[in-house]
């Protein structure tokens, strides 16, 4: 394993441990309305949780905390655990299928570890019914970190470490042979589909900084979209295909995406290329790792943090 890759793995591991062991943090599940600019707190807790998905019917969110997955009503209320069987080391890479029937997630498949003391290289992707159940394995190779469903629900995108490099892969949602979509040196991560399935948006270090890129669904014709002093992560196209929301660290982080940092959520207009800052907060890892738009595309969900 080369030195650069080892350093990246260590940074990811340390970031995870720092947050997982931080009891003095308040997590807030919020929504942001892109028309009014209003932030609304849906749920908050004096513990650490991450990565909201907004259900296709608009009635609930899925978050992760302490290795487990939870459902939170969209109108607020008490979180309820989603049964995942033996998969109890779930991380913040999870998402609901377009038809609302399945939940995909990544789980550290380490029988000797716990969520606070896990083996990074054991992450696999699984699915369960949206109501919970016995997990079905999707990826046999490790590590694999889920990121998106295709619009038709037939394919998944994920980031995987193969041949000492993190790249973006696609695989049938029911499992099968994985297809490598990127092969540039450095980290490629945070992939998500445009609603019509034509493009995949992702973040990449291939330019020397973490920027947002897009490519054809087959991995061809990569094109850089952002070029600024920030570290830009996790582009998520809106349901109407007009925008994508993404996270920007206000200070360059190299290829790391640590937690509890000053960040901005920004909106990229796909017609004009204009970028609008929506709001600033304390966050990063766990804020908007996975797709979180409302079904009507007027709002998206995120997690903001406050240390006490």
Where are these regions (language model features)?
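Residue-level detector of Asp-centered blade-edge/turn motifs that repeat once per structural unit
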Residues: 56-57, 98-99, 151-152, 195-196, ...
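Short loop/turn segments that connect beta-strands within beta-propeller blades
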Residues: 34-37, 73-77, 129-133, 172-176, ...
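Hydrophobic beta-strand positions that form the internal "hydrophobic ladder"
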Residues: 60-61, 103, 153-156, 197-200, ...
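A short beta-strand motif characteristic of beta-propeller blades
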Residues: 38-43, 78-84, 134-139, 177-182, ...
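A flexible loop/linker signature enriched in serine peptidases of the S9 family
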Residues: 21-26, 43-49, 61-70, 84-91, ...
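Positively charged n-region of N-terminal signal peptides that target proteins for export
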Residues: 1-4
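Bacterial N-terminal signal peptides
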Residues: 7-16
């Amino acid at each position: 394993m080369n030195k650069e890759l080892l350093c990246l793995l260590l940074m990811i591991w340390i970031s995870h441990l720092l947050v997982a062991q931080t009891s003095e943090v308040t997590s807030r599940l919020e929504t942001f309305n892109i028309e009014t600019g209003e932030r609304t707190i849906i749920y908050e807790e004096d513990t650490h949780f991450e990565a909201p998905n907004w259900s296709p019917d608009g009635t609930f969110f899925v978050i992760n905390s302490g290795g487990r997955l939870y459902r939170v009503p969209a109108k607020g209320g008490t979180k309820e655990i989603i049964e995942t069987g033996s998969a109890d080391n779930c991380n913040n890479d999870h998402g609901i299928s377009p038809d609302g029937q399945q939940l995909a997630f990544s789980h550290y498949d380490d029988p000797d570890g716990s969520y606070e003391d896990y083996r990074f290289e054991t992450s696999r992707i699984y699915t369960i019914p949206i109501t919970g159940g016995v997990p079905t394995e999707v990826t046999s190779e490790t590590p694999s970190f889920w990121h998106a469903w295709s619009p038709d629900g037939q394919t998944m995108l994920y980031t995987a470490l193969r041949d000492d490099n993190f790249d973006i892969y696609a695989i049938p949602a029911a499992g099968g042979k994985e297809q490598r979509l990127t092969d540039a040196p450095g980290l490629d991560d945070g992939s998500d589909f445009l609603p019509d399935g034509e493009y995949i948006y992702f973040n990449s270090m291939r330019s020397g900084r973490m920027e947002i890129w897009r490519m054809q669904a087959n991995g061809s014709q990569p094109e850089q979209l952002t070029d600024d002093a920030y570290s830009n992560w996790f582009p998520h196209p809106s349901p109407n295909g007009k925008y994508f929301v993404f996270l920007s660290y206000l200070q360059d982080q190299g290829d790391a995406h640590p937690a509890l940092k000053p960040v901005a959520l920004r909106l990229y207009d796909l017609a004009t290329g204009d970028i609008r800052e929506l709001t600033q907060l304390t966050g990063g890892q766990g804020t908007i790792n996975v797709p979180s738009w409302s079904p009507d595309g007027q709002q998206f969900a995120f997690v903001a943090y406050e240390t006490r």
